[in-house]
Curated annotation (Swiss-Prot):
This is Thiamine-phosphate synthase. It comes from Mycobacterium tuberculosis (strain ATCC 25618 / H37Rv). Pathway: Cofactor biosynthesis; thiamine diphosphate biosynthesis; thiamine phosphate from 4-amino-2-methyl-5-diphosphomethylpyrimidine and 4-methyl-5-(2-phosphoethyl)-thiazole: step 1/1. Mg(2+) binds at residues 82, 101. Its cofactor is Mg(2+).
Amino acid sequence: MHESRLASARLYLCTDARRERGDLAQFAEAALAGGVDIIQLRDKGSPGELRFGPLQARDELAACEILADAAHRYGALFAVNDRADIARAAGADVLHLGQRDLPVNVARQILAPDTLIGRSTHDPDQVAAAAAGDADYFCVGPCWPTPTKPGRAAPGLGLVRVAAELGGDDKPWFAIGGINAQRLPAVLDAGARRIVVVRAITSADDPRAAAEQLRSALTAAN
């Protein structure tokens, strides 16, 4: 079931716990109603972390419960970033791993059998390894510099073109990093058909409308 939902996914949203706003449930509802297919909790470097400190495990699980409930009501997938233990405890559908996180085979020993795993990639060798490897999907970028990953050079749309040539549609992959409605046409022209966004929706005055705009463009391209 998760595999088929992943295969049809086009719009992937990463959000923090929105502790400084206190509106996580309402925000998730709006974003998912707008067409988000996968919603991931990623609080690292967030305004809430800067104001209140790192999200503690108990609070992280509470935020996970909110997102998971909303995702499942909309037939979407709920993802956790980095932490296999939190993903297992929260019953996440997806765990996303960076290049320096657990190897996929180790993470699978911790996770429930049906949990999907994604991997970040930042250069052509990593893209090729992910396309041939045992992760269920991979992300390619950053397409543009982003405050979510401060100090990380952006390989740009050239890496998206590499992924389009290598990956095709054999394994789902998503372009990531600084993507918004204005930049999306260039991302699509480079060959991506799935995207991950953060600020394009999390900073929007109307998250539902922002998601709908992105979703409409992705649907037209597919």
